[in-house]
Swiss-Prot record:
Compartments in which it is found: Cytoplasm
The UniProt record lists the keyword rRNA processing: no
InterPro entries to which the protein is assigned, alphabetical: Cys-tRNA-ligase, Cys-tRNA-synt_Ia_DALR, Cys-tRNA/MSH_ligase, CysS_C, Rossmann-like_a/b/a_fold, tRNA-synt_1_cat_dom, tRNAsynth_Ia_anticodon-bd
GO biological process: one example: cysteinyl-tRNA aminoacylation
Residues engaged in binding Zn(2+): C28, C212, H237, E241
The protein's name: Cysteine--tRNA ligase
Catalytic activity reported: tRNA(Cys) + L-cysteine + ATP = L-cysteinyl-tRNA(Cys) + AMP + diphosphate
Sorted UniProt keywords: Aminoacyl-tRNA synthetase, ATP-binding, Cytoplasm, Ligase, Metal-binding, Nucleotide-binding, Protein biosynthesis, Zinc
Gene: cysS
Length: 464
């Protein structure tokens, strides 16, 4: 049985789907004004693994992850680049897709864009107005938090205790400081950048919170199983989604389970432009770090715990994956005829405990190394690979992994072993290592002075 920590009830619960034959999940996706940073990527990777697990356990899963392609940040980026919102959002949506593909994230079932759902947004706002949960004020439309008695059910915040002006937008047109905008009138910049649409309240654009309520309803209906996102979205975004959606549909439970991944810091500091410490996925990839290493680094800490990003996180992840890939050096793996480790799946079922699942991979690796029977070794290795690939790692072959130019250490480690073998006159082992290097795409040449030169996809390097 799958168990998930439900932020709504503040406890880990057995996952009981609304319809066991069709699981529905909505996750807040990116605001496409810049390339994705590792905080964005952590959320995408976490829910990618949850998506895989739910499909494995239940079969049919509809996974909706939105794109916010109209927002103040996008408008500011368009202004700064002397561009327009369509060009900015299209470009950064494309880079987002490329970066997420590089870290082995599957596409969601649907990926709706806010700008393609303006009609749905307007209809939902009209429903809230008709039900008395929203009001017009100076060409704005606001949601009235006082009209929804359960406001604060997710975050535990009470209306009269909110810190207005921090995460809550303050406005002169509101009846209550906690009221949030559903529709805002177009300003000069909106007209300049074409970031406005016609509505019953005049030309304007939607507020952020109403977009997700409208898109989740359009693609999943008024009730669905799981709503996911980063813990930073719990308030006010997710709190406001609940208020909107349950006010629009009186009998609705909206999302049954609320799942939140933890914060990500860099060297124990919050990522911010002012600290110049924003780590972009694309920059990591361009520096030669493999997408699989980035993915593993984002998964090795439990999804609900804070993750501190340091140089050690990357180096340790690279080292672990190198260790895992070495198990494949003499084996051509076709894992279609084997099953994922049951213990591995049970770990994932326990509130997506990926660190526990990874610990099981390490145990399997130890067992593979200890096994002398070749048939048993092959059988164990197949199960090991099948399990690892379940969370999106070990997707390459041994040769591909170590011939990519990142793994100097592995090449030099093998050359060291070959040198020792030759010194011990163990020429069979030396020849096997030469062949192993050849399979990795590395050619070696022994020099008269005792050094070895190796050639791969990179420039030749003299190893001493």
């Amino acid at each position: 049985m799958v168990k998930l920590y439900n932020t709504l009830t503040k406890k880990k619960e057995p996952f009981t789907p609304i319809d066991k034959d069709h699981i529905k999940m909505y996750v807040c996706g990116p605001t496409v004004y810049d390339t994705a940073h590792i905080g964005n990527a952590r959320s995408i990777v976490v829910y990618d693994v949850l998506f895989r697990l739910l499909k494995f356990c239940y079969g049919k899963v509809t996974y909706v992850r939105n794109i916010t392609d109209i927002d103040d940040k996008i408008i500011n980026a368009a202004n700064e680049k002397n561009s327009n919102i369509e060009s900015i959002s299209k470009y950064y949506t494309k880079t987002f897709h490329e970066d997420m593909e590089s870290i082995n994230c599957a596409e969601p079932t649907y990926e709706p864009k806010a700008t393609e759902n303006i009609d749905n947004i307007i209809k939902l706002i009209e429903s809230l107005l008709q039900a008395g949960h929203a009001y017009e004020s100076n060409k704005h439309v606001y949601f009235s938090v006082e009209s929804y008695p359960e406001y604060g059910v997710l975050s535990g915040k009470k209306i009269d205790e909110l810190n207005y002006g921090s995460r809550v937008e303050v406005g002169e047109n509101k009846k209550h400081p906690g009221d949030f905008v559903l529709w805002k009138p177009a300003n000069e910049t909106d007209y300049k950048l074409s970031s406005h649409w016609n509505s019953p309240w005049g030309e304007g654009r939607p507020g952020w919170h109403i977009e997700c309520s409208a898109m989740s309803y359009a693609y999943l209906g008024k009730d669905f199983d799981i709503h996911g996102g980063g813990i930073d979205l719990q308030f006010p975004h997710h709190e406001n989604e609940i208020a909107q959606s349950k006010s629009a549909f009186a009998e609705s439970t909206f999302a049954k389970y609320w799942v939140h991944n933890g914060f990500l810091t860099v060297n124990e500091e919050k990522m911010s432009k002012s600290l110049f410490n924003i780590v972009k996925v694309r920059d990591l990839l361009d520096s030669g770090i493999k997408g699989e290493v980035i993915r593993y680094a984002l998964l090795k800490t439990h999804y609900r715990k804070p993750l501190d990003w340091t140089e050690n996180v990357i180096s340790e992840s690279q080292e672990t994956l190198n260790k895992f890939y070495r198990l494949l050096r003499s084996t051509c793996i076709e894992e279609s005829d084997t099953e994922v480790s049951k213990d591995f799946i049970e770990a994932l079922k326990n509130d997506l405990n990926i660190p526990e699942a990874v610990a099981i991979l390490h145990e399997m690796a130890t067992e593979i190394n200890k096994t002398s029977n070749e048939y048993e070794k092959l059988k164990l290795t197949k199960k090991f690979v099948k399990s690892a690939r379940f969370i999106g790692i070990l997707e390459s072959s041994y040769q591909e992994w170590f011939a990519s130019g990142v793994s100097h250490q592995e090449i030099e480690r093998l050359i060291d072993l070959r040198k020792v073998a030759k010194q011990n006159k163990d020429y069979d082992t030396a020849d096997k290592i030469r062949e192993q290097l050849k399979q990795m795409g590395v050619t070696i040449s022994d020099n008269e002075d005792g050094t070895t030169t190796w050639y791969g996809k990179l420039s030749p390097i003299v190893y001493r």
